[in-house]
Amino acid sequence: MPDGFPFETTIKTETFGKGRTKIRVYMRRVEGSSGVSLMECTNPVKDKWRIRWDVQEKENGSASYMEEEFGHKPTDEEIHTLVMSWYNSQTDAAILSGFAYNGAHVWLSVENQYNYKAAYDLAVQTGGETLPVTFKFGSDEQPEYHTFTQLEELKDFYTKAVGFIQTVLAEGWEKKDKFNLELYRIE
């Protein structure tokens, strides 16, 4: 998954006030200098501000970070909401497409998670009588079908999938907990 996935530069025009128009450039990953300001007024005349987060400094003195431009000085709530929603999206994307079982990519959409849980629960409740069960892994272009014939094998798959989800969630919570809004305060 590339840095900043699934975000690209998006431009949106909004009307506010007395028919005034503002243009917002939505979240993008930027390459720049290490030590970059997390909040910066880039154009005082037009009241343009940039918010930066997820700064990843590199050995060569440069840095990569996410950035969003505002047509006004963003409030604490706007900054917090922006960064938290980005971390939530990153966590969701990692859960959705980051798990593999025995080398096969497993798409963990909410629907698939529900189907895996239902199949596992039913197999446990019936002592494996509902087996075999077949799941499609991989992609639509390169599907890999896996048939679970033994309860232990299905249990192994399901507990690894749940463990992966829990690990990714914990990593996302840790990043969100480390976010410090005080670093964005400018007097």
Per-range role (PLM):
Residues 1-187:
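A preference for well-ordered globular domain cores
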